[in-house]
Amino acid sequence: MKVKPSVKTICEKCKIIKRKGRVMVICENPKHKQKQG
């Protein structure tokens, strides 16, 4: 899980979602997981 000031999708399987008011990227590839904060 990477924490970044701005999250971006890396591949076409990455999805941007909102969880508990936080913007996150979820993907099949665990290296692509990101959280904004």
Curated annotation (Swiss-Prot):
Membrane spanning residue stretches: none
InterPro entries linked to this entry: Ribosomal_bL36, Ribosomal_bL36_sp
Species in which this protein is naturally found: Ruminiclostridium cellulolyticum (strain ATCC 35319 / DSM 5812 / JCM 6584 / H10) (Clostridium cellulolyticum)
MF terms (GO), sorted A to Z: structural constituent of ribosome
Gene Ontology CC annotations of this record: cytoplasm; ribonucleoprotein complex; ribosome
Gene transcribed to yield this protein: rpmJ
Protein name, entry field: Large ribosomal subunit protein bL36
SUPFAM superfamilies the record matches: Ribosomal protein L36
Keywords: Ribonucleoprotein, Ribosomal protein
Organism domain of life: Bacteria
Pfam families: Ribosomal_L36
Matches recorded under HAMAP family: Ribosomal_bL36
Family named by the database record: Belongs to the bacterial ribosomal protein bL36 family.
Disulfide pairings: none
NCBIfam families, alphabetized: rpmJ_bact
Keyword Ribonucleoprotein: yes
Gene Ontology BP annotations: translation
